[in-house]
Amino acid sequence: MHSRKICVSLGQPTMPQALEASLRIFGADVIEVRLDYIDVPEIDPFVESLATDLLFTCRPTWEGGLFAGTEEDRLALLAEAVRAGAAYIDLELRSAEESHQYLRTYLAERETELILSYHDFESTATLAKLTGIIDQMQDAGADIGKLITTANSAADVVRVFQVLEYAAKKGLPLIAFCMGEAGAVSRVASCDLGGYMTYCCADGAEVTAAGQITISEMRGIFARYP
């Protein structure tokens, strides 16, 4: 049984633009608010305006994002998202241990789920390394793992699919697919191979990651291949 859960990522640079874009999204199961893209990010306007489950991400520059502020300020935004009732927050696996401890403490007895994420913007590592990353995510207390690599060949995509199987055996819900043109198929197929969720961009919006497709395109593919 596949989930085919779709998350639409918002990448607008201002609060008014991001809010307006979020209200025009139809058919998404989750909306990801990229706080690192917004010039003066706020949490409450999204929570108050949207009934869709919200995922808040504040990706630092060292993991391919735009946030260049202090770790204290970044964690404060994520903690505020938890307080406001976010369904998910995304924290990088490679964040400092102190950051992990802070958010684990803040998440205690709250319903927000923690996604621990890992991104490789150049390649896809060996299967042994990738499964080791899954072990690290589970050991670090992830509710959901997120493993995103860059595919330079079909073999890279196959390895990521093997990681989905490994995570399922470990009991860790996992988001896993490949960026890049060679990995575009994985964004669709991962949902049918045990992936927890896939990511799209809104119709008419700029992509927030290489190889990303729009939600209408994704829904169309799912409809053709039920």
UniProtKB/Swiss-Prot annotation:
CDD domains: DHQase_I (cd00502). It comes from the Bacteria. Keywords: Amino-acid biosynthesis, Aromatic amino acid biosynthesis, Lyase, Schiff base. GO terms for biological process: 3,4-dihydroxybenzoate biosynthetic process; amino acid biosynthetic process; aromatic amino acid family biosynthetic process; chorismate biosynthetic process. Signal peptide: none annotated. The active site is at H119, K146. It catalyses: 3-dehydroquinate = 3-dehydroshikimate + H2O. InterPro entries: 3-dehydroquinate_DH_AS, Aldolase_TIM, DHquinase_I, Type-I_3-dehydroquinase. 3-dehydroquinate binds at S9, E32, V33, R34, R59, R187, T208, Q212. Pfam families: DHquinase_I. Gene3D superfamilies: Aldolase class I. One of its GO terms (molecular function) is 3-dehydroquinate dehydratase activity. Its EC number is 4.2.1.10. Pathway: Metabolic intermediate biosynthesis; chorismate biosynthesis; chorismate from D-erythrose 4-phosphate and phosphoenolpyruvate: step 3/7. Involved in the third step of the chorismate pathway, which leads to the biosynthesis of aromatic amino acids. Catalyzes the cis-dehydration of 3-dehydroquinate (DHQ) and introduces the first double bond of the aromatic ring to yield 3-dehydroshikimate. Belongs to the type-I 3-dehydroquinase family. Homodimer. This is 3-dehydroquinate dehydratase. It comes from Desulfotalea psychrophila (strain LSv54 / DSM 12343). The gene is aroD.
